[in-house]
Amino acid sequence: SEYKGDFYFIDSGSTDGSSEFIKNSGHHYISLEKNLGVGYSIITAIKFAIENEYEIICGISGNNKMDPNEINNVVNPIIKEDIDFVQGSRFINYESNSNTPKFRVVSIPILSKIISFLFKTKVTDVTCGFRAYKLELVKRAKFEIDKKWLYGYSFEPYFYTNVFLDQHVLKKEVPVKMSYPSD
């Protein structure tokens, strides 16, 4: 990797053996006793990063479709261009993502166009779980992130809606590869 950084995994009560794999990998991890939702896991990571004075957080959905080797592609705009928020997109370089299920090929661009229109911003893949942002963005936010109703899937739309609404936040999309299992 081009940059020095720490990798922390959030184990939210997984039962698929991944927690044992992480424990034996030598990587840092935060183990939650039970799964309280994806939002809770992200909030836990953000709070941990702020408490430990990290500057950037990069999240990758734990669905095994994104390549961690692309972390530099997602983080580079923050470090080199002073961007605040970077969103991965499987549609910027679609040729490398040609195995994306047809339903997603049709529905995600439609949803992304609606979001782009509503928030007067350009985004091509609002559902991609590969993102990075400056923690300063969270620290200076005019919205609360530690609310119980955000512990499930509500956190990501809530957080990103606030990011998209803030015209002072410098945003950028970068291409990422998504790998779906072949049927």
Task: Locate each region found by the language model.
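Conserved donor nucleotide-binding strand/loop of the catalytic core
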Residues: G5-Y8, S19-N52
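Acceptor/aglycone-binding surface of glycosyltransferases and processive sugar-polymer synthases
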Residues: K34-F48, I56-G59, P68-Y153, P181-D183
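Active-site acidic Asp-centered loop
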Residues: S12, C58-G62
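Short beta-strand/loop segment that forms part of the nucleotide-sugar
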Residues: S1-S14
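Catalytic donor-sugar/metal-binding loop of nucleotide-sugar-dependent glycosyltransferases
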Residues: W149, Y160-K177
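A short, conserved beta-strand element in the Rossmann-like catalytic core
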Residues: G13, G37, K65
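Residue-level signature of catalytic and energy-coupling elements of molecular machines
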Residues: A45, N63, K134, V163, ...
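Residues at the starts of beta-strands that form the adenosine-phosphate
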Residues: D6-F7, I56, L170
